[in-house]
Design a protein with these regions (language model features):
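Active-site loop/oxyanion-hole signature of alpha/beta-hydrolase fold enzymes
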Residues: 111-147
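Conserved hydrolase catalytic core segment
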Residues: 144-186
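Alpha/beta-hydrolase fold catalytic core
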Residues: 2-78, 102-104, 324-325
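Catalytic active-site module of serine/aspartate enzymes centered on a nucleophile-bearing elbow/loop
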Residues: 293-325
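Conserved HGGG/HGGXW glycine-rich cap/lid loop of the alpha/beta-hydrolase fold
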Residues: 66, 72-116
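Short beta-to-alpha linker loops that shape the active-site pocket of alpha/beta-hydrolase fold enzymes
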Residues: 110-115, 178, 301-304
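Conserved serine/cysteine hydrolase catalytic core
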Residues: 223-299
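Flexible "cap/lid" loop of the alpha/beta hydrolase fold
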Residues: 173-205
Length: 325
């Protein structure tokens, strides 16, 4: 009898446990909200100082409702335009632009929302991005035709640009660009990538990037990108990347619509792929080069995705080859 009484008094009561769990959860939520609020205020104040501490190296150009950052150096013709990959900006081309500007006119820019550029309208599809690039080059007064150089996701943008404005395209250099035919894999990865970028945006928005400056900086980042990490990889850039990721299936479909036999005619084209690619990726690279009668497929010795940083001489040589016509 005593044992039963003891059991009744010591047995955990479900309602009591539930109330304790709810109180703990509520406390955790309150603490998270408070911490986020403090971080948000801290980040907002610090972000206002970025314009002074991390000024844009180029100029802001109005493209109809928002302004994009354009950075042009050097002189010569044709002008080389550098297009960055997903979650990257003009800073990812620092090494190439610095060296190339000694002999050519070269322009890098930030797509809407990235780094020093203002946010743009949605959806952020390849067609919209190519249209904004065209508007930027037109409004800036940078004369074409242009040698379009793209890395990764940036390939979507320049391929749509070349299809729509063929007369303004002097040539293409495509550095390990995205495969628009991998729609099944893209449909699976699209929401996962968007969630990851949403987390990155939150980390930047509540000031954690400033507390740990390398939190969102990829290992391949250039010295300039690292020095300006709070702008280059800040919450605005992460939001822009997320918007592009959400539209990536539509972008791939738009790019695929430009593919047809001899689509690029006799346009000078170089497709650069890293070493160690899968057969599927290699087949895509070969198919791109075959779209032009003057298409050239080059395999780097590096296995790195950022070939322009791992082997800048290779990329510079191919840009010069295409620019020479």
């Amino acid at each position: 009898m005593a044992d039963r009484k003891l059991e009744r008094t010591t047995r955990p009561r479900p309602r009591r446990l539930l109330r304790a769990l709810l109180r703990a959860t509520a406390l955790a939520v309150v603490l998270l909200v408070l911490a986020s609020g403090v971080g948000f205020a801290y980040e907002s104040n610090a972000a206002r100082a970025d314009a002074r501490e991390h000024p844009a190296p180029g100029r802001l150009v109005d493209v109809g409702g928002h302004r994009l950052h354009l950075y042009c150096t050097g002189s010569g013709s044709p002008t080389v335009v550098l297009e960055a990959g997903l979650a990257e900006s003009s800073a990812s081309w620092e090494v190439i632009q610095r060296r190339l500007s000694a002999r050519s006119r070269v322009c890098s820019y930030d797509r809407a929302g990235y780094a020093w550029s203002q946010e743009g309208p949605s959806p952020r599809t390849a067609e919209r991005l190519a249209g904004e690039l065209h508007a930027l080059l037109t409004a800036s007064g940078e004369a074409g035709p242009y040698v379009m150089v793209a890395h990764s996701f940036g390939g979507n943008v320049v391929r749509v640009f070349a299809d729509r404005w063929r007369s303004l395209t002097a040539g293409l250099v495509l550095v390990d660009v995205t495969d628009e035919t991998a729609l099944t894999a893209l449909r699976i990865s699209q929401p996962l990538l968007a969630v990851q970028l949403s987390v990155n945006q939150f980390v930047a928005r509540v000031g954690l990037l400033r507390l740990r400056g390398d939190a969102l900086v990829p290992p391949e980042a250039t010295p300039f990108a690292r020095a300006n990490a709070t702008v280059v990889y800040g919450s605005g850039s992460m939001a822009a990347a997320r918007a592009e990721a959400w539209a990536s299936v539509d972008s791939a479909t738009q790019v695929a619509a430009t593919v047809r036999p001899h689509a690029w005619g006799d346009l000078p084209v170089t497709v650069i792929r890293p070493a160690g690619q899968s057969e599927e990726d290699s087949a895509h690279a070969r198919s791109l080069a075959a779209l032009s009668s003057r298409g050239r497929l080059v395999t780097a010795t590096t296995t790195e995705h950022y070939v322009q940083n791992a082997q800048p001489d290779l990329v510079l040589d191919e840009i010069a080859r295409v620019a020479a016509g």
